[in-house]
From Swiss-Prot:
Nop domain residues: 285-410
Compartment(s) of residence: Nucleus, Nucleolus
Compositional bias (Basic residues): 582-592
Start and end residues of each stretch annotated as Disordered: 443-592
Gene Ontology terms, MF aspect: snoRNA binding; snRNA binding
Function: Required for pre-18S rRNA processing. May bind microtubules.
Name by which UniProt lists this protein: Nucleolar protein 58
Length: 592
């Protein structure tokens, strides 16, 4: 079988013919092809098609990189159509598959590792195989073609178009962190001079602008704060500046604080500009995705996937949990429930849903978003297509999802075209307002002197005295619960005095018994409760230790066990006697 070798160069296509049909199976191929003479003895030039210009060379090589067969290459391969039993060696397997699909070309393609040695030798000694090709010209053409190819990839790569979105959303997140850090530093720094301002003014940007406008708090009389603050806050700020308890600072300190405040204001203005730029880029590149989930969530999805093309290749289930990979793998490892949503959770449609409907909306929204992303990434729009036409799929899908969500939540359906806020209400533009910070409510303070006397004198822990149980023979009856009249108050006082006297008498008896036992009253009571006090025939108490009690319990257990064993032995002896009697009776019957 005749072997042909296809070689792509910066100058053109070369088709080489092997002199040995079993060239690729030789063991000494690497040593034979080490020199130019050895390569010339192994292969010879069959045909060579030169590129007409640098632009043509760029077009041909760009097609080869994508695995496409160009008309120029197809015409070169037509020269070996008529030959029988032909094999063709190709360096790129992707290109080999494309050549194999050409109609009317019955050849055996070889695109594996066996061709590596011969291709290495051909590239090293290419000028000796192609007549009229100088090594200097070859290197110049290779360098120019590589530069053109790199420029072409950077300019026309579809993955590079959305790089602006990836970088913009990353910068937006960084700006938010830096802006928050700088604003907190301004508040802490200027708070030494004017601490009351932070309690009145919540907005960080307005705070920084006020620092730049007023400077020292003593300038409150001459400062016009109407451009920064509304009327309801301007008065409290000036009043607080008049009676502020802050420390004095030097002019040098104020200049440094104002320099930092300028950075805060500058960052805030640039962040607003960057957010507008990101919205415009998202509407231009991914209009359907933006219509469904918003510009910020859509940009984060694209940044997480790497590019719009990579995101379009993902199924709806992947888009739904994109950004929650750590929770997903932890759930799979511990065999728990997997997360229902990732970055898509921050979309307004999911924010409007409540309870179990959040998971349902996340699933449906991810399915619609996957369709919209594929349209954004792969659709070829005409030049006269409007933005409404490009975003028609996303707009229609969002309208249907809003109606579905309203049906799930049991809410009235909104008219078409009405924007819906995350809380489910119709979104309307609001006037910018600066809310006053919450102040400390001094009226809610309560002093100990303000409390009623009964509450003040009341103890935290009340000791309830033990009441003596009345004897069954006694004629006294317990007092009934409920309201008492004035006439019964005297009787209750008498009863209390009687109980107090009886308690004193009982304590006196216990003291006498404790003295006989040689113990204190508290210890005697404790031992009496535990059962460690025994009385003899005369009624004299004696204290028993815990060890003696344990020994007595053990001896009682042993005695009970011994009785059980004796019973078992006696039962066993009776059974043996009965068995012997039965055997004797059987013997007598046998003798008879």
């Amino acid at each position: 079988m005749t072997l042909f070798i296809l070689t792509e160069t910066s100058a053109g296509y070369a088709l080489l013919k092997a002199k040995d049909k079993k060239l690729l199976k030789r063991d000494d191929l690497a040593t034979e092809a080490a020199t130019a003479e050895g390569v010339s003895n192994l292969v010879k030039l069959k045909s060579f098609q030169k590129f007409d210009s640098a632009a043509a060379a760029l077009e041909e090589v760009a097609s080869l990189v994508e695995g496409k067969v160009t008309p120029r290459l197809a015409s070169l391969l037509d020269e070996i159509k008529d030959e029988k039993k032909v094999s063709l060696a190709v360096a790129d397997p992707k290109l080999g598959n494309a050549i194999g699909k050409l109609p009317g070309l019955d050849i055996q393609l070889i695109a594996d590792s066996t061709t590596a040695d011969i291709y290495r030798a051909i590239r090293e000694h290419l000028p000796t195989l192609i007549p009229g090709l100088l090594p200097q010209d070859m290197s110049t053409m290779s360098l120019g073609l590589s530069h053109s190819l790199a420029r072409h990839k950077l300019k026309f790569s579809p993955d590079k178009i959305d790089t602006m979105i990836v970088q913009a959303i990353g910068l937006l997140d960084d700006l938010d962190k830096e802006l928050n850090t700088y604003a907190m530093r301004v508040k802490e720094w200027y708070g030494w001079h004017f601490p009351e301002l932070a309690k009145i003014l919540n907005d960080n940007i307005a705070y920084a602008r006020l620092v730049l406008k007023m400077g020292m708090r003593s300038n409150w009389e001459t400062s016009d704060l109407a451009e920064i603050l509304p009327e309801e806050l301007e008065g409290p700020v000036k009043a607080a500046a008049d009676r502020s308890m802050g420390t004095e600072i030097s002019q040098d300190d104020l200049e440094n604080i104002q320099a930092l405040a300028e950075q805060v204001v500058g960052f805030a203005e640039y962040r607003q500009q960057l957010a507008g730029y990101l919205t415009a880029r998202m509407n231009a590149i991914a209009p359907n995705l933006t219509a469904l989930v918003g510009d910020l969530v859509g940009a984060r999805l694209i940044a997480h996937a790497g590019s719009l093309t990579n995101l379009s290749k993902s199924p709806a289930s992947t888009i739904q949990i994109l950004g929650a990979e750590k929770a997903l793998f932890r759930a799979l490892k511990t065999k728990h429930d997997t997360p229902k949503y990732g970055l898509i959770y921050h979309a307004s449609l999911i924010g409007q849903a409540t309870g179990k409907n959040k998971g349902k909306m996340a699933r449906v929204l991810a399915a619609k978003a996957s369709l919209g992303i594929r349209v954004d990434a792969l659709a070829d729009w005409e030049d006269d297509a409007t933005e409404e036409d490009k975003a028609a799929l996303g707009t229609e899908a969002r309208y249907n999802l809003e109606r579905k969500l309203a049906a799930m939540e049991g809410k009235p359906l909104k008219p078409r075209g009405v924007a819906i806020a995350p809380n489910g209400a119709s979104a309307q533009p609001k006037k910018f307002e600066l809310n006053e910070a919450r102040k400390y409510n001094a009226d809610a303070d309560a002093l100990s002197s303000d409390e009623p006397k009964s509450k003040k004198d009341k103890k935290l822990i009340e000791e309830v005295s033990d009441e003596e149980m009345a004897d069954a023979d006694s004629d006294e009856e317990p007092a009934a619960n409920g309201t008492k009249d004035d006439d019964s108050s005297d009787d209750s006082e008498e009863e209390k005095s009687k109980k107090h006297k009886s308690k004193k008498g009982k304590d006196a008896e216990l003291e006498k018994l404790a003295e006989r036992a040689g113990l204190s009253l508290k210890r005697y009571k404790r031992k009496l409760e535990r059962g460690e006090i025994t009385f003899d025939a005369d009624g004299n108490p004696t204290a028993v230790s815990k060890k003696d009690l344990k020994k007595a319990k053990k001896e009682a257990k042993k005695a009970s066990k011994g009785d059980e064993k004796k019973r078992k032995r006696s039962d066993d002896g009776e059974e043996v006697d009965n068995a012997e009697k039965k055997q004797k009776k059987k013997k007598k019957k046998g003798e008879e």
